[in-house]
C-alpha cells in the first residue's frame, strides 16, 4: 500500500512561556524561562516548590463556564490548544467531511487535580458528595471526546497515553491514519496539568524533580554538570494534520510535512533509560527509515533533554548512535525543557510544534542554563542563545517515557 503524504496545517499551544504558538515561540527564541514558584497550594513541606505553570489562562475564550466546570484543567488546556489549531488551519467541518476528520489527543496522567478533590469529598463527606461528572472530567480520552463533540469531528477518535511520549505518539499515529486512508485530517497532540499536590509529591518522592528552590528559573539545566532532576510543567500542544492533496486543494497554509515516525522500547527499567542510549536510538533510526533520510540530513534535534543525570547523557549517546559520526558533527541539538520544564504527556506535542517552527523560521531555540556542560558529549547543544541556520530541510523531535517507551518524529521543510 502506498502511503499518502501528511502535512501540518494548524498549530495551537498553551505553555509555561506563552498561551499561543506565537508567544511561546518568541519567548523560547529569547531564552526566557517559564518556571515559577507554585502558589496555588501550600508547598511548605514539599521538596520542590516550583514548576512550569500556564499563566493567565481564561477558559471562557474557548468554552462556557458551565462546560468548564465539568472538566479538569488538562481537558480545558487541550481543548484550548485544539481550538487554536483548528482556527489556525482554516479547516471547515461540515456534514460532508466530518467523518473524515478525527482526533488523537492524550494525556500522560489525566485529571489528577479532580481525582484528588474527588477522593477528598468521598473520604470526608461520603459517596453521595462525589460529583456525577467525576469520571468524564478526569479520564484521559475526554479531550478528544469533548473536542469532537464541540466541533462535530466524526472520524477516528482516540487518546494514546504513553507517559512522557504521549503527545508525540498521538501525532505519529494520527499521521499514519491519514497516510493509510483512515482520515483526511486529524487534530492531534497531548495535554497535561500535573502541578498538583499529589503530582508534585509523587515525582518528588521518586527523587525525579530538581530541588533548586532558591533559583527556580535555573533549575532545568539539561546536560549541565549541576543538573539535579527535571522541572514539572503544564500545558498543551495540538496540531492539525492533513493529507497533502486535501490541504493543497483548499489552499491551506502548510507549515511542514510529517515524513518520519519511529517507536521503540528500552526493555530496561521502569523509570531510567537504557544507559547506552540504544532504546532511543532505535526510535530515531526507525523514524529515519520511514522518512528515507540519513543522519547527515537531520539539521536539528529537539531533544527529550529533561535535565536528569542519567537521561541527558543516554539521549546524546542515542543521537550519536542513530545519526552516525558524520551526522553528529553537523547536527544542532537543544532542549527547550530548559525553559518550559517537562510537560509530561504534552511535552512531545509542544516540542513537535517547536521543531516545526525551527524549520519555518530557520531558527534553532537554545538550551539555557548550560553553564558547565557535561564533558565528552561531542554535540553542539546550542547553549544560551538561539541560532540562525540556512537551508535546514529536516528536523527531528524525540520523546522518551517511563516504562521505556520511545518515539521520534521527523518533519520536512515545505
Curated annotation (Swiss-Prot):
Enzyme kind, highest EC tier: transferase
GO CC annotation, single: cytosol
Residues of the Ketosynthase family 3 (KS3) domain: 3-413
Any Gene Ontology biological process: fatty acid biosynthetic process
The EC number(s) this enzyme carries: 2.3.1.179
UniProt keyword list: Acyltransferase, Fatty acid biosynthesis, Fatty acid metabolism, Lipid biosynthesis, Lipid metabolism, Transferase
Molecular function in Gene Ontology: 3-oxoacyl-[acyl-carrier-protein] synthase activity
Pathway: Lipid metabolism; fatty acid biosynthesis
Reaction equation(s) it catalyzes: a fatty acyl-[ACP] + malonyl-[ACP] + H(+) = a 3-oxoacyl-[ACP] + holo-[ACP] + CO2; (9Z)-hexadecenoyl-[ACP] + malonyl-[ACP] + H(+) = 3-oxo-(11Z)-octadecenoyl-[ACP] + holo-[ACP] + CO2
Active site (catalytic residues): 164, 304, 342
A Pfam entry, by short name: ketoacyl-synt
PANTHER family per UniProt: 3-OXOACYL-[ACYL-CARRIER-PROTEIN] SYNTHASE, MITOCHONDRIAL, POLYKETIDE SYNTHASE-RELATED
Entry's family note: Belongs to the thiolase-like superfamily. Beta-ketoacyl-ACP synthases family.
Assembly and binders: Homodimer.
Chain's role: Involved in the type II fatty acid elongation cycle. Catalyzes the elongation of a wide range of acyl-ACP by the addition of two carbons from malonyl-ACP to an acyl acceptor. Can efficiently catalyze the conversion of palmitoleoyl-ACP (cis-hexadec-9-enoyl-ACP) to cis-vaccenoyl-ACP (cis-octadec-11-enoyl-ACP), an essential step in the thermal regulation of fatty acid composition.
Protein name: 3-oxoacyl-[acyl-carrier-protein] synthase 2
Organism phylogeny: Bacteria, Pseudomonadati, Pseudomonadota, Gammaproteobacteria, Vibrionales
